[in-house]
Amino acid sequence: MNDNFLNIQIECCLYKQTPSIDKFKFWIKSIFLHFKKVSEINLRLVEKKEIKNLNKKFLKKNYPTNILAFPCIMPNNDQISFLGDLVVCSEIVEKEAKNQNKSVESHWAHIIIHGTLHLLGYDHSNNSNKIEEMEILEIKFLNLFGYHNPYF
């Protein structure tokens, strides 16, 4: 897999503990390798105002959130498929980590894993089996990356 699978757009001020581009690439590339996917995604780091506007426009929820995943709906190319966009609010991720007494890096990893799984077709809306399936995968990847289970 080449290194041209991730396009990162930074539209916010970066915090001291925002992961490096290499860290984002490592997490996402590892997930793709696990699923034997050769794909591309866009990762956009934004301010609260932008993610709130996107959440309202696309999900009809009038509040900011930590991450939004926008899967791409178009025919797959045999060589490379574009999975979609992840939009993350750095400020919210870092505040959540602090409020939940988690390391900022492990929470970032969890959020990126969660969003990438959404782009791969995993969902957790109103189905306990789907929620459990997604959480098991999140925990598996977090453990692989050296982080603890975020649900305990």
Curated annotation (Swiss-Prot):
Entry's family note: Belongs to the endoribonuclease YbeY family.
InterPro entries named in the record: MetalPrtase_cat_dom_sf_prd, YbeY, YbeY_CS
Organism: Wigglesworthia glossinidia brevipalpis
Bound cofactor: record note: Binds 1 zinc ion.
Named cofactor requirement(s): Zn(2+)
UniProt-listed GO biological process terms: rRNA processing
GO cellular component, one term: cytoplasm
Tree of life domain: Bacteria
EC number: 3.1.-.-
Keywords: Cytoplasm, Endonuclease, Hydrolase, Metal-binding, Nuclease, Ribosome biogenesis, rRNA processing, Zinc
Binding site for Zn(2+): 114, 118, 124
Root EC class: hydrolase
MF terms (GO), sorted A to Z: metalloendopeptidase activity; RNA endonuclease activity; zinc ion binding
Pfam family, one: YbeY
SUPFAM superfamilies: Metalloproteases ('zincins'), catalytic domain
Localization: Cytoplasm
Known role: Single strand-specific metallo-endoribonuclease involved in late-stage 70S ribosome quality control and in maturation of the 3' terminus of the 16S rRNA.
Main location: cytoplasm
Protein name according to UniProt: Endoribonuclease YbeY
